[in-house]
Amino acid sequence: TFENDPRIEACDATFPGVDLQIPAFKAMHPMGARLSQECVTTMADTMVSPLFHNQFRVPSYQDWVDHEADYEKVYEFHEWQLQHLGWKVMRDRWVLKTGAHMWGLEHLLARYPDARIVFTHRDPVKSMTSYASLTSLVRSMGSDEVDPIEIADDWTARIKTMLERSIQVRDGKNHPQAQFFEMHFQDFVADQFGVVEKIYDAFGLPLTGQAADRMKVFIADNPKGKHGIHRYSPEEYGVDPVRVRESFGPYMERFGLEPESL
């Protein structure tokens, strides 16, 4: 069954090593076989994923991922992986997550034309600082030379480009706006289940009582800070709030984002 699949135990056995190497990672991104994990790891099996430039400093490779890689093949393999993971216990709908889908959103929608896309929006100063913090920590697992300021500059520019690309895709004539839902990160933190209810309602999806109860239990069992607090500041990574907000100005205005306290 879904609950006793032997792959669960095999997967869980891989995580203690991460906890030993970078114990602070759990506070940023808890991992477990029964927890959600980002598609960026499955995309890595195609060798087309920002995961590698997160873990290692390989800018020329990431340039190729950004501008030349074949995302049609990425999502063909992505579908095979979902079929492999779910063939014993088929469900009505997958819930998938990763910012890396910005890179190939057009091909994701071609592969899964009935997909419903939730965009999470946040003050880019906070987003870029958090991303730089996570990347700096992950790179420290394999290198003694980690430049957090370079990481922030590099990824801020790349993510801005991919964000603009994904907005161009969704603004095209091929995809109805009802296929997309806008969510502010701060709203989700304040009322996780309330936002989930809005998502289900917006997409016309049934939310069963059993599913709602399980979500509420999970939220109660996993409060913010359960595994420690992830602390970071723009100054540590050379993130200039004024410059970043000016650069992302059209994005912030379009989606009604206000500057967060730093």
For each predicted feature, which ranges?
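PAPS-dependent sulfation machinery
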Residues: 1-94
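Flexible, glycine/threonine-enriched loop-and-boundary segments that flank and lead into catalytic domains
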Residues: 87-114, 172
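Long, contiguous hydrophobic alpha-helical segments, chiefly transmembrane helices and signal peptides
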Residues: 82, 94-95, 119-121, 244
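Well-ordered alpha-helical segments embedded in enzymatic catalytic cores
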Residues: 77-81, 104, 165
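Conserved phosphate-donor/acceptor-positioning beta-strand/loop module used by diverse small-molecule
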Residues: 97, 108-133
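Flexible loop/turn segments at secondary-structure boundaries
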Residues: 73, 101-107, 125-128, 189-192
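PAPS-dependent sulfotransferases, especially Golgi type II membrane carbohydrate sulfotransferases
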Residues: 63-75, 86, 131-182, 186-262
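Active-site-proximal structural scaffolding
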Residues: 71, 98-101, 110-113, 120, ...
